Amino acid sequence: MVDTCFVEELASAAPAPGGGGASAYVGALAAALASMVGNLTVGKKAYTEVEGEVMHHLAELKGLRSRLIELVDADARAFEPLAAAYRMPKGTPEELSAKQEAIQRALVGATEVPLDIMRTVARVVDHADYLAHHGSRMARSDAGVSAAFARAAVDGASLNVYINAASMDDADRARRVREEASAIASTTRERCDELFDFVVKEVS
């Protein structure tokens, strides 16, 4: 049932997929677990009053899950021009200049994709939070795992933002992406921890 191809590729010596793609994949799992809670709620008499709202969250999560799967590959694609730029020759001043320009261009994409991962996972948490509080109590532990995975996904993606921003010559752009990543990470971390603690109390 489990497709091990991605895991095996991740374990290989290939530079991509790496931490960014893995973070997107973990984010997709967070969305899937939140969806599981919703799907186990729909159709149950005890949750008739919230069924319409649950269906809304399920529809949103489906889109977010698909987007995160797309971002797994997008992260690998964003790394390719950066890796190619680092391999460019630098034997002459002209070659060195061309190499540096190529690196700087590639760094933009290499930071934007993990930022997109972070933004998307933060939205997953919105829906997971609702479903943890209003969805099936039988699946509440799965909502907690969703929160834990979402936290890991955001933290992982943030590292890719920071490491690439550190190499940017454009100090203003670097500052902006670092600040956005830091803000998303801080807020999402806090929300995920609160949600996880709520689930622990509910299931203990």
Residues covered by each model-derived region:
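Acidic, Mg2+-coordinating active-site segments of isoprenoid diphosphate-utilizing enzymes
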Residues: 40, 45, 82-89, 156-168
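Amphipathic alpha-helix face/heptad-repeat signature
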Residues: 25-29, 57, 64-71, 106, ...
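Preference for long, well-ordered alpha-helical segments
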Residues: 120, 124-127, 131, 139-199
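A structural-propensity feature for long, helix-poor, extended segments
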Residues: 45-84, 184, 191
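Short, hydrophobic/aliphatic alpha-helical segments
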Residues: 1-17
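Amphipathic alpha-helical interface segments
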Residues: 75, 79-148, 152, 164
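Conserved phosphate/anionic-ligand binding catalytic regions in large, soluble enzymes, centered on
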Residues: 12-33, 139-157
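A conserved active-site cap/scaffold subdomain adjacent to cofactor or substrate pockets
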Residues: 33-40
